[in-house]
């Protein structure tokens, strides 16, 4: 029905065809089971079968493509041999030529798709610039709009992954999630504006609104929690908790663990160090800022089989006599035991027993490393000092006994002389 609709067809070379509209199915020869509805819809179709094309110029250039559904003005207009596609909306899949198995729903969704296969683009301009990227799912207005060749991506949310061009195997879920990603790959961003400024960063996981917001090129980071990892660029970091790792200005760090916005747990993954209630491990494998306790005593390996160069400890008493015990108050009682404390001055102990003092100098960031004392290591020294003192005491006792015996003998001798 319509002027020159199905003009090239005869009743003997096609079947079950419906052509309605000016020059609809104009060049159809043997294509069967087609429905072309609208001016010039399916105009150049020759042998393509089982197509449904509804709208002005819809599927205009289709020749042999079959099993397509194009609905909307100029939807799938340039498709020639592509098959098993569903394009719904104005200019949806407009430039598709030989793409297969695509679903584009929304005005200009998949507009530039040329030969890419098995994509699902839902939303106005979703996947608009895609030409060869395959196996993508873009859902939301302008989701994946600039994607050209990136493949295996899932972008869900308005403007999610809008600037992605070549990045692949990314999952962006949330409004503007991964907004500026261009070539970054294998990222998972979930939450509004999650990973918003990421451009080339790879293998990141950002979960939570604004998480990893300002990361651009950092790789292998895990930020979980609203605003986690804001203003951070770096690699191999783990931030867990709302606002954890949120910095007021641009910040770069690598290989760090942060749990809780107040640094409840902090780790230096490259140095195998862990700190609690602070973001400074003070060059120690395990550091607690504040009071710590437990239900069982602290155990330290001491098996003889683990040791070498074993020698008795000498001069312990003299070392102990040189130590000066003090009472003191910490300047910062927020992170230290409040009130009066008992201890030593580390710098003084270092002059006497350097083996029990660590610290000093500066860390890789230029921060001062405070001295600390291994108080438990003083125990063997105190034991040996007591033993030395006991030995001296025994010697004095023996000497005293001898003196007492001599005095007693002299007293007897004097008494005999006086008789």
What name fits each language-model region?
Residues 1, 271-276, 283-312, 317, ...:
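Glycine-rich, low-complexity segments
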Residues 1-291, 295-299:
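Glycine- and small/polar-enriched repetitive beta-structure motifs of secreted/surface proteins
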Residues 300-309, 327-342, 365-367:
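Active-site-adjacent substrate-recognition loops and nearby beta-strands
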Residues 302, 309, 361-419:
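C-terminal intramolecular chaperone/auto-processing assembly modules
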Residues 316-319, 345, 382:
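Stable alpha-helical elements in mature extracytoplasmic
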Residues 316-327, 332:
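Acidic, glycine-rich loop-and-strand cores that form catalytic or ligand-binding grooves
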Residues 348-365:
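Active-site and glycan-interaction determinants of carbohydrate-active enzymes
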């Amino acid at each position: 029905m319509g002027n020159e609709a199905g003009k090239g067809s005869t009743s003997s070379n096609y079947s079950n065809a419906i052509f309605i509209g000016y020059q609809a199915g104009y060049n159809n020869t043997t294509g069967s089971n087609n429905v072309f509805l609208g001016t010039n819809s399916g105009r150049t179709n020759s042998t393509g079968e089982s197509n449904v094309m509804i709208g002005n110029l819809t599927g205009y250039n289709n020749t042999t493509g079959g099993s397509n559904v194009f609905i909307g003005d100029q939807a799938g207009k340039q498709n020639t041999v592509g098959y098993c596609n569903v394009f719904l909306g104005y200019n949806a899949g407009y430039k598709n030529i030989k793409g297969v198995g695509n679903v584009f729903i929304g005005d200009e969704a998949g507009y530039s798709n040329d030969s890419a296969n098995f994509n699902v683009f839902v939303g106005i301009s979703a996947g608009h610039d895609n030409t060869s990227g395959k196996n993508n799912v873009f859902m939301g207005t302008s989701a994946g709009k600039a994607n050209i060749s990136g493949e295996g991506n899932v972008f869900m949310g308005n403007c999610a992954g809008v600037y992605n061009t070549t990045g692949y195997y990314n999952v962006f879920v949330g409004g503007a999630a991964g907004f500026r990603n261009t070539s970054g790959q294998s990222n998972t961003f979930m939450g509004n504006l999650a990973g918003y400024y990421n451009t080339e960063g790879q293998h990141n996981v950002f979960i939570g609104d604004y998480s990893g917001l300002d990361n651009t090129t950092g790789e292998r980071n895990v930020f979980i929690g609203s605003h986690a990892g804001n203003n951070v660029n770096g690699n191999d970091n783990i931030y867990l908790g709302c606002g954890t790792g949120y910095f007021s200005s641009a910040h770069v760090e690598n290989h760090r663990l942060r749990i809780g916005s107040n640094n409840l747990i902090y780790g230096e993954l490259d140095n195998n160090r862990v700190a609690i209630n602070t973001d400074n491990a003070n060059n120690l494998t395990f550091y607690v800022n504040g009071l710590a306790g437990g239900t069982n005593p602290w155990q330290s390996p001491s098996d003889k089989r683990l040791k070498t160069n074993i020698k008795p400890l000498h001069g312990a008493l003299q070392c102990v006599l040189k130590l000066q015990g003090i009472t003191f108050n910490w300047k910062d009682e927020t992170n230290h035991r409040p009130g009066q404390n008992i201890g030593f001055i580390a710098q003084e102990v270092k002059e006497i027993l350097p083996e029990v003092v660590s610290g000093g100098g500066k860390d890789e960031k230029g921060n001062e490393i405070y001295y600390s004392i291994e108080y438990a290591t003083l125990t063997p020294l105190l034991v040996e000092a007591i033993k030395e003192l006991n030995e001296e005491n025994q010697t004095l006792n023996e000497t005293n006994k001898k003196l007492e015996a001599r005095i007693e003998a002299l007293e007897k001798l004097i008494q005999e002389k006086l008789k």
